[in-house]
Amino acid sequence: MKTDLTHVLDALVDRKAVDPVVLDLRGLSGATDYFVIVSGTSAAHVRGMADHLVTALAPRGLKPHHVEGLAQGRWVLLDYVDFVVHVFHPELREFYQLERLWGDAPVVAAGDDGGSQ
């Protein structure tokens, strides 16, 4: 699983993901093991990161079980069953505060801010 998460983060950071975080939900949620949470800078950026992630993971045999929000580009949810990727527009990430909602979940990875340079 760690290898899959590494590929997820690499693909998102490659597309300038902002504030990437991975939460370990094992023991806290029966729905999934990990949340990967990132932000984009615009709806186009959010859609582009989500599209790139699906394309980048496909050769590894990883395909999302379900995708929500791609057309709008405000909050794209990619459900890979063992992990769920949330790609947010900044305002929605701040509004929903998943990191705070799941505050008991250990942060197992947090990357550099790919969007600042």
Question: Which residues are covered by each model-predicted region?
Answer:
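Polybasic/polar functional segments that serve as interface/processing modules
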Residues: 1-32, 40-76, 88-93, 98-117
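Active-site beta-strand termini and strand-to-loop segments that position acidic
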Residues: 78-80
